[in-house]
């Protein structure tokens, strides 16, 4: 096992990465190794997808499957070894079908990629795990060095984050052939074990630029189906009655659940990154969507244990449900998996609803505590002139984007302390689950404009980018000249690709933490600092002083 993709990875003087029987996330060595094997199979599939496009062949089954299967290897998504192997087998079957299509056009069709003809050696998980050793990401570290390995992983993990957003967009009916062609090209190239530093740096920026397009179609999918988010108050306390909790990012799953629970007497609560759903008109119209439950994903083993109903995980993040003894009432959807947990293959939530009706639910309603969400792209753009007016009248000094992933590390209190230290004449724009560090606090307003503005899920960084570009255009300056600072927390691969997206768009002087990714070497950090001004957090006082004086 070697895995260094998330922020909680093991760090020692000898090197970074989880390399024992189990990773810090709870992923076993077996599952981790089989995920490496799956990635190799997906690289071979992408290699043939690139070749097929040379012949004018676009196989939508391949395009739909590849990012989804890659998403299953993201942190805290799928811990179920047999399902990972199932994805690998499906990848190879699709590859062979695509290969046959190519050969029907050109009998000499050939794909020159190390992964192009990969076959699984056995049905036995132990044998497959031994085969997976050929594809361990750091297998040639001694030959290529830490810097090249770090750049490879930056590209692989960044592309993995983009694949997750591609799957979210696909679920909502969005497709862009150029994006998929670019995805397959990059995925196939990474399967050649590239070792050119400049080429890898260019690839990282290409992934960021591609992801900007992905976030654009995801935004289109969400707003076309569910309307543009508008500011909405959400209760974060319990309401009397039977209940279901839904977590993750999949708004379509939430919509289906709301439709199927309507009139059943079962209330629905959002959790984690599903909180922004309350801002969408077509979702909040359901009166039994009564609130949001819990805090950051890392607290779920305590909070889920206390929730008196079933729980549905639609995407990341799931952690060991046996710890809180709620494994008999947590359900996984789509690419999510945990051994022994009930999995929903389709869109029928009937078994979940039946379980909710058999459980006690909340015995009484607590005193409501309301927070505000729903500052989506359209709403944010509607504030642009107000923001400019406040700045011109010196009522608004600075905007801080404080957001990103949450996690268990104690150093993440930095982001709570930073938000509460922001001066009263400054605004906080937030997104993703990092907001749970401070989103239940009171920040007041500036002439009626809330000082805490919740833009949505992690992918809604797109909305923040569009706002920044719009402000810069209206003010006749560059984005980096705005009174705007980005203070980002990271945990997993979606955050990595958001960072690459920002860097590829030329956004500079981003402050990130609580620690640097374990695959970043001192040399790579120095390169990113020199090119983009990217740096790690220090202390709240020092960072605040520096950002306000920039």
From Swiss-Prot:
Its cofactor is [2Fe-2S] cluster; hybrid [4Fe-2O-2S] cluster. InterPro entries: HCP/CODH, Hydroxylam_reduct, Prismane-like_a/b-sand, Prismane-like_sf, Prismane_a-bundle. Hybrid [4Fe-2O-2S] cluster binds at residues 249, 273, 317, 405, 433, 458, 492, 494. Keywords: 2Fe-2S, Cytoplasm, Iron, Iron-sulfur, Metal-binding, Oxidoreductase. Its main location: cytoplasm. The keyword Oxidoreductase applies. Gene3D superfamilies: 1.20.1270.20, 3.40.50.2030. It is an enzyme of class 1 (oxidoreductase). It holds the Pfam family Prismane. Binds 1 [2Fe-2S] cluster. Binds 1 hybrid [4Fe-2O-2S] cluster. Disulfide bonds: none annotated. [2Fe-2S] cluster binds at residues 3, 6, 18, 25. It is found in: Cytoplasm. It comes from the Bacteria. GO terms for molecular function: 2 iron, 2 sulfur cluster binding; hydroxylamine reductase activity; metal ion binding; peroxidase activity. Catalyzes the reduction of hydroxylamine to form NH(3) and H(2)O. HAMAP family: Hydroxylam_reduct. This is Hydroxylamine reductase. It comes from Salmonella dublin (strain CT_02021853). The gene is hcp.
